[in-house]
Amino acid sequence: MEYRPLGRSGLKVSALSLGTMTFGEQNDQAEAFAQLDMARDAGINFIDAAELYPITPKAETQGRTEEIIGAWLKSRGRPDDWVIATKVVGPSPGMP
């Protein structure tokens, strides 16, 4: 895997990141864990997430993707080996 500097942070991130917008809706936790394991084994250390994930946003699943990522990091250890890019959409009608 090729790694690139993340600005002037001193961090190096993999040239590829793992997108997670389906974790918690289209993919259950076991499937998400398998995808995260595969990404780790391929040398990926960069995960893309968002507070509104999974897509399509629903009040009952909002934030579930980040919960799954957190559970995976806790179960696998070494959370400092990862860079997680996340974003916030902000208030939306019908969402908490």
Model-inferred region functions:
Residues 81-92:
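A short, structured active-site edge motif that brings together acidic residues
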